[in-house]
Amino acid sequence: DGKEIWQFKTEESFTISNSKFSLIIINDMVIFSNSIGDITAINIKTGLITWQLPTQSSSIINETYNFKISKLVSDGNSIIFSNNKNEFHSIDAKNGTINWINEINSNITPIITGNLIFTVSNEGYLIVIEKNKGNIIRVTDLFKYYKLKERKKIKPVGSAIGNTNLYLTNTDGKMIVVDLNLGVVKRVEKVSGDFISRPFIVNDNIFVI
């Protein structure tokens, strides 16, 4: 009937944040991030906190304009996310304890496939990570075809995986297609003259906005 069941107020920052909120549902928990890097799990029926994990020090409250965090993704057991403070996290979905942290500078949404995690750093490196231990398996420079001056201006927007390819869109309107088996760039396509969205794959078709 549209009646409010419960509400939960999150921490407010003192500045306007560039960080986007993210929310996922795992079993009986609503799990979300906020602008200062806290990850909170709420009981979906009662609205009470199940657990909360602050990922940043208290000083981040005054620096939230520059803080960016990726969307949360999960395999049902672990929650994966990263930020532009050189931190890539895996935490236990049941209790919020940290499984591992790796030094990766990225605020785009990571992708979980089987026992692997794929992400692209803000500097344009495709990084393949072993999901359980956080070991980096492979690193591929996707921006190596750009001149240094151009490279400094370009940031990844988002990625998607279809079959054995990864598709990465960038702020320059180009899409990079990567062969995941070989770890090499297959081609670079100009999609737009300017900023485009992350790619979406539906029924073997790729969509960007």
Can you annotate each of these PLM segments?
Residues K3, I44-G47, D92-N95, E130-K133, ...:
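Short loop/turn segments that connect beta-strands within beta-propeller blades
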Residues K3-N27, L48-G76, T97-G114, R138-I161, ...:
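Extracytoplasmic beta-rich repeat domains
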Residues F32-S33, S82, V120, T169, ...:
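Residue-level marker for isolated small/hydroxyl-bearing positions within beta-strands
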Residues F81-N99, S106-T109:
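Beta-propeller domains
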Residues I117-I127:
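Acidic (E/D-rich), amphipathic helical modules within compact regulatory domains
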